[in-house]
Amino acid sequence: MSYQEQQCKQVCQPPLVCPPRSAQSPVLCQSAPSLVLLQSAQSPIHCQSALSHAHLSHASRNALLCNLLHHASKSAHPRANKGFSSLQNQKKRTESILHKSIATPPSSI
């Protein structure tokens, strides 16, 4: 288990949401994992990446990393987490199928 995964198990919290103070004033929030420009009624709301600020506490940074890792693991292919031996077994099966298809001539129509 990687260091980031260990930290995620300790501190995994949803990202903070920065509500606008008013419809006419821009709001700067540091909770989104990427630079986002949202349009409100009359002025933009700027959300900067929390990962780019050095003054964040370890807990905040770990929580953001945890959320990113959690999202990545959800979107990953279900078989992507299998071990190396599974890849070797799959190679052997593929080679076996290819060998059988070469050894057996196709039936004539």
Swiss-Prot record:
UniProt Sequence repeat ranges: 21-29, 30-38, 39-47, 48-56, 57-65
Gene that this sequence comes from: Sprr2j
Natural source organism: Mus musculus
Protein name, entry field: Putative small proline-rich protein 2J
Residue span of region 5 X 9 AA approximate tandem repeats: 21-65
GO biological process: one example: keratinization
Tissues with expression: Not expressed in uterus.
Function: Cross-linked envelope protein of keratinocytes. It is a keratinocyte protein that first appears in the cell cytosol, but ultimately becomes cross-linked to membrane proteins by transglutaminase. All that results in the formation of an insoluble envelope beneath the plasma membrane.
A cellular component annotation (GO) from this entry: cytoplasm
